[in-house]
Amino acid sequence: DKKSAIKKSEAYTTTDGTLHIMISQRKPVVRFVSDKGGWYADETGFIFPLQKKFTSRVPIVDGAIPLDISRDYKGLPKTKYEKAWVEGILDFVQYLNENRKWRDAVAQIHVEGNGHLVIVPRNGREKFEIGRPDEFKKKFAKIEDYYKFIVPEKGADAYTKVNVSFDGQIVCRK
């Protein structure tokens, strides 16, 4: 089935005529939502369509998803760029899942038109511009610095955008 999330299936009969079916499902780790449609990806980067009867509770990445695929696409990303981008997102999601503090703090992961990531925290009005999906440890350390040094001095609602994608700096905008 083109819409299935089945990773592997085996069927066989025994000598007494009993039919045995073994199914292994794909486990989604992230959900992509764009104006082109929605898809899941598993830990290997395999992309498959959303299911009508079930929604997995996984991080949602929305916005300008840079994948040129149809709504019912099932397979690995088509180009080197798409593969690298999906791998970056999977690394990002894995980083969030391994760091409970950040997993609980991030409400939304949004993709800008240039493919860069913006995260929206559950608390506060600022949006954090992450840039490319790489160097997460450094970027989240800058977010910690923002809360540790800038918020106490300027106030919690002083900025709406905080860019942590630049090397060695935090750029705040009202």
What is the meaning of each model-derived region?
Residues 1-5:
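Amphipathic, non-transmembrane alpha-helical segments in extracytoplasmic/periplasmic proteins
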Residues 8-174:
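Charged, solvent-exposed interaction patches on well-folded alpha/beta domains
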